Amino acid sequence: VICPLGVGEHFEYWGFDPAKIVELDWHEQQTLGDGFTVRCLPSRHFSGRGRSSNQTLWGSFLLQTPARKIYMGGDGGYGCHFAEIGEEFPDIDLAVLENGQYDEAWKYIHTMPDQLAKAAKELGARRIMTVHHSKYALAKHRWDEPLATEAALAADTAQHLLRPEIGEVVPLETPQPERAQADDPTGL
Protein backbone atom coordinates (compact mmCIF):
# COMPACT_ATOMS: atom_id res chain seq x y z
CA VAL A 1 0.00 0.00 0.00
CA ILE A 2 1.44 3.38 -1.01
CA CYS A 3 -0.18 6.42 0.58
CA PRO A 4 0.56 9.99 1.69
CA LEU A 5 2.22 10.72 5.05
CA GLY A 6 0.12 9.78 8.06
CA VAL A 7 -2.47 7.77 6.13
CA GLY A 8 -0.78 4.43 6.80
CA GLU A 9 -2.30 4.37 10.28
CA HIS A 10 -5.74 3.94 8.70
CA PHE A 11 -4.56 0.97 6.63
CA GLU A 12 -3.07 -0.62 9.75
CA TYR A 13 -6.41 -0.18 11.53
CA TRP A 14 -8.12 -1.91 8.60
CA GLY A 15 -5.80 -4.90 8.95
CA PHE A 16 -3.05 -4.25 6.41
CA ASP A 17 0.43 -5.47 7.31
CA PRO A 18 2.44 -2.42 8.48
CA ALA A 19 5.52 -3.85 6.75
CA LYS A 20 3.70 -3.47 3.41
CA ILE A 21 2.63 0.16 3.90
CA VAL A 22 4.79 2.92 2.41
CA GLU A 23 4.04 6.55 3.29
CA LEU A 24 5.35 9.25 0.97
CA ASP A 25 5.71 13.00 1.24
CA TRP A 26 5.13 15.19 -1.82
CA HIS A 27 7.85 14.62 -4.45
CA GLU A 28 9.05 11.38 -2.86
CA GLN A 29 8.94 8.20 -4.87
CA GLN A 30 8.87 4.49 -4.24
CA THR A 31 10.65 2.17 -6.66
CA LEU A 32 8.64 -0.97 -7.26
CA GLY A 33 11.13 -2.84 -9.44
CA ASP A 34 11.26 -3.70 -13.15
CA GLY A 35 11.17 0.00 -14.07
CA PHE A 36 8.00 0.83 -12.11
CA THR A 37 7.87 3.79 -9.71
CA VAL A 38 5.15 5.63 -7.82
CA ARG A 39 5.67 9.29 -6.96
CA CYS A 40 3.53 11.26 -4.51
CA LEU A 41 2.74 14.72 -5.88
CA PRO A 42 0.89 17.80 -4.62
CA SER A 43 -2.87 18.09 -4.55
CA ARG A 44 -5.25 20.65 -3.12
CA HIS A 45 -7.62 19.35 -0.45
CA PHE A 46 -7.56 18.73 3.29
CA SER A 47 -7.53 15.61 5.42
CA GLY A 48 -9.61 14.31 8.27
CA ARG A 49 -12.64 15.79 9.95
CA GLY A 50 -13.24 17.40 13.33
CA ARG A 51 -10.40 17.02 15.83
CA SER A 52 -8.31 14.91 13.46
CA SER A 53 -8.43 17.56 10.73
CA ASN A 54 -5.26 18.11 8.67
CA GLN A 55 -3.08 15.63 10.56
CA THR A 56 -2.24 13.63 7.44
CA LEU A 57 -1.07 14.61 3.97
CA TRP A 58 -3.28 14.52 0.88
CA GLY A 59 -1.72 13.92 -2.50
CA SER A 60 -1.87 12.87 -6.10
CA PHE A 61 0.26 10.14 -7.66
CA LEU A 62 2.23 9.46 -10.81
CA LEU A 63 2.73 5.82 -11.77
CA GLN A 64 5.64 5.42 -14.16
CA THR A 65 6.11 2.13 -15.96
CA PRO A 66 8.69 1.28 -18.62
CA ALA A 67 6.06 2.20 -21.23
CA ARG A 68 3.60 4.66 -19.62
CA LYS A 69 3.05 7.60 -17.28
CA ILE A 70 -0.31 7.61 -15.50
CA TYR A 71 -1.31 10.54 -13.30
CA MET A 72 -3.97 9.98 -10.63
CA GLY A 73 -5.22 13.32 -9.38
CA GLY A 74 -7.31 11.92 -6.56
CA ASP A 75 -9.83 14.08 -4.76
CA GLY A 76 -8.87 17.73 -4.98
CA GLY A 77 -9.41 21.23 -6.25
CA TYR A 78 -7.77 23.14 -9.05
CA GLY A 79 -4.41 24.78 -8.37
CA CYS A 80 -1.02 25.66 -9.83
CA HIS A 81 0.14 22.11 -9.10
CA PHE A 82 -1.39 20.87 -12.39
CA ALA A 83 0.85 23.14 -14.50
CA GLU A 84 3.89 22.30 -12.35
CA ILE A 85 3.28 18.56 -12.70
CA GLY A 86 2.73 18.92 -16.46
CA GLU A 87 6.06 20.74 -16.80
CA GLU A 88 8.00 18.32 -14.61
CA PHE A 89 6.49 15.20 -16.18
CA PRO A 90 5.76 15.83 -19.87
CA ASP A 91 4.14 13.16 -22.01
CA ILE A 92 1.66 11.83 -19.45
CA ASP A 93 -0.26 9.06 -21.19
CA LEU A 94 -3.36 9.10 -18.99
CA ALA A 95 -4.61 11.56 -16.37
CA VAL A 96 -7.37 10.40 -14.04
CA LEU A 97 -9.06 13.60 -12.84
CA GLU A 98 -11.87 14.47 -10.48
CA ASN A 99 -15.13 15.60 -12.08
CA GLY A 100 -18.11 15.59 -9.79
CA GLN A 101 -19.46 16.35 -6.33
CA TYR A 102 -18.50 19.98 -6.84
CA ASP A 103 -20.03 23.17 -5.49
CA GLU A 104 -18.87 26.80 -5.55
CA ALA A 105 -18.40 26.59 -1.76
CA TRP A 106 -15.98 23.68 -2.26
CA LYS A 107 -14.02 25.05 -5.24
CA TYR A 108 -10.72 24.82 -3.37
CA ILE A 109 -11.12 21.11 -2.62
CA HIS A 110 -13.19 19.83 -5.59
CA THR A 111 -12.41 20.73 -9.20
CA MET A 112 -15.16 22.85 -10.74
CA PRO A 113 -16.38 22.08 -14.29
CA ASP A 114 -14.76 25.17 -15.79
CA GLN A 115 -11.46 24.19 -14.17
CA LEU A 116 -11.44 20.62 -15.47
CA ALA A 117 -10.44 21.53 -19.04
CA LYS A 118 -7.80 23.94 -17.70
CA ALA A 119 -6.29 21.24 -15.47
CA ALA A 120 -6.31 18.75 -18.36
CA LYS A 121 -4.54 21.20 -20.67
CA GLU A 122 -1.93 22.10 -18.05
CA LEU A 123 -1.13 18.45 -17.40
CA GLY A 124 -0.79 17.86 -21.15
CA ALA A 125 -1.94 14.25 -20.88
CA ARG A 126 -2.78 12.42 -24.09
CA ARG A 127 -5.88 10.87 -22.55
CA ILE A 128 -8.19 11.92 -19.73
CA MET A 129 -10.55 9.81 -17.66
CA THR A 130 -12.74 11.41 -15.02
CA VAL A 131 -13.81 9.94 -11.68
CA HIS A 132 -15.70 11.07 -8.56
CA HIS A 133 -19.09 11.13 -10.29
CA SER A 134 -22.25 9.08 -10.92
CA LYS A 135 -21.97 7.03 -7.72
CA TYR A 136 -23.45 9.04 -4.84
CA ALA A 137 -24.95 12.47 -4.16
CA LEU A 138 -22.79 14.80 -2.11
CA ALA A 139 -23.35 18.00 -4.10
CA LYS A 140 -26.49 19.72 -5.35
CA HIS A 141 -25.85 19.11 -9.06
CA ARG A 142 -27.68 16.41 -11.01
CA TRP A 143 -26.00 13.01 -10.88
CA ASP A 144 -25.30 13.16 -14.64
CA GLU A 145 -24.12 16.78 -14.85
CA PRO A 146 -20.42 15.81 -14.62
CA LEU A 147 -20.86 13.57 -17.66
CA ALA A 148 -22.18 16.56 -19.59
CA THR A 149 -19.10 18.57 -18.61
CA GLU A 150 -16.96 15.78 -20.02
CA ALA A 151 -18.47 16.40 -23.45
CA ALA A 152 -17.36 20.03 -23.20
CA LEU A 153 -13.91 18.90 -22.05
CA ALA A 154 -13.55 16.60 -25.05
CA ALA A 155 -14.57 19.40 -27.42
CA ASP A 156 -12.34 21.97 -25.70
CA THR A 157 -9.03 20.09 -25.48
CA ALA A 158 -6.73 18.07 -27.68
CA GLN A 159 -6.77 15.18 -25.22
CA HIS A 160 -8.78 12.07 -25.93
CA LEU A 161 -11.48 11.49 -23.33
CA LEU A 162 -11.96 7.93 -22.10
CA ARG A 163 -15.52 7.20 -20.99
CA PRO A 164 -15.54 3.54 -19.96
CA GLU A 165 -18.69 1.92 -18.74
CA ILE A 166 -18.59 0.49 -15.23
CA GLY A 167 -16.43 -2.64 -15.32
CA GLU A 168 -15.13 -2.05 -18.85
CA VAL A 169 -11.44 -2.64 -19.52
CA VAL A 170 -9.94 0.03 -21.78
CA PRO A 171 -6.50 -0.73 -23.24
CA LEU A 172 -4.49 2.49 -23.40
CA GLU A 173 -2.99 1.72 -26.78
CA THR A 174 -6.29 1.41 -28.67
CA PRO A 175 -8.90 4.10 -29.35
CA GLN A 176 -12.11 3.84 -27.39
CA PRO A 177 -15.41 3.92 -29.27
CA GLU A 178 -17.40 7.12 -28.94
CA ARG A 179 -19.98 7.14 -26.17
CA ALA A 180 -23.19 9.06 -25.73
CA GLN A 181 -22.67 12.76 -25.10
CA ALA A 182 -24.26 15.27 -22.76
CA ASP A 183 -27.80 14.82 -24.05
CA ASP A 184 -27.70 11.13 -23.08
CA PRO A 185 -25.02 10.64 -20.41
CA THR A 186 -26.21 7.15 -19.57
CA GLY A 187 -25.36 5.77 -22.99
CA LEU A 188 -28.75 4.04 -23.10
Sequence positions of predicted segments:
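Core dinuclear metal-dependent hydrolase active-site scaffold
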Residues: 24-90, 166-188
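Short beta-strand scaffold positions
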Residues: 2-3, 73
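Helix-loop-beta element that forms the nucleotide-linked donor phosphate-binding surface
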Residues: 11-23
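Short low-complexity, flexible loop/linker segments enriched in glycine and/or proline
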Residues: 17-18, 37, 143-145, 177-179
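Conserved beta-strand segments of alpha/beta enzyme cores
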Residues: 20-22, 37, 160-162
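Cap/insert and terminal regions of metallo-dependent hydrolase folds
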Residues: 3-12, 79-166
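Structured beta-strand-rich core segments of catalytic domains in phosphoester-bond hydrolases
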Residues: 6-7, 18, 33, 38
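Short, structurally constrained coil/turn elements
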Residues: 15-17, 32, 155-157
